[in-house]
């Protein structure tokens, strides 16, 4: 959303969300108060309650308003792989590239999992699933070579691969394992997702 198209209220909401993101990443969700968020956003404490009733509502708004999936989804929907393999390779590269440009959302994901037990994930899925699930249904019906025939399971495993890629990338980075990894670990990761670790019997 461009600044010139935003109302004053929308600009204020986004300022509150940006302030909250920075504080959540600096000191954690539970250690951050509404007063601190208001101060960081240059608002009076009463002013913040004109837009959000609670800190939880701010966190939920961040997930809905600012998550990179809003930019990623149209790019993935535009992928036209002739085969399932081509589609998943292209889609994975797009997601990794775009999420890699917003590392703060990977850290917010940890806050979501640890402090909220993933409850906001269901909110995000309400928006994502109706748009993404038809893609997986199409590939299950149309493309040969798939061993998984449940579209929801296929979508879950694809999302799981993306999350595990970023989690392990953070852990392995600058560790003793880092120099032992393939030069392009993302390509190696999608290869494992597509073909597994076992060779086909001769």
Model regions and ranges:
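Short, charged helix-capping/linker segments at alpha-helix termini
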Residues: 30-31, 145-149
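Amphipathic alpha-helical packing segments from all-alpha helical-bundle domains
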Residues: 70-71, 118-145, 152-153, 167, ...
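C-terminal peripheral helix-coil segments that are non-catalytic and often amphipathic
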Residues: 2, 97, 101, 133-142, ...
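Amphipathic alpha-helical linker/stalk segments
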Residues: 62-91, 136
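Residues in soluble alpha-helical coiled-coils and helical-bundle/repeat scaffolds
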Residues: 39, 50-57, 61, 82, ...
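Short secondary-structure transition hinges
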Residues: 97-135, 178-180
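Helical hydrophobic small-molecule/effector-binding pocket
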Residues: 64, 86-111, 159-166
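Helix-turn-helix
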Residues: 15, 19, 23-57, 61-62
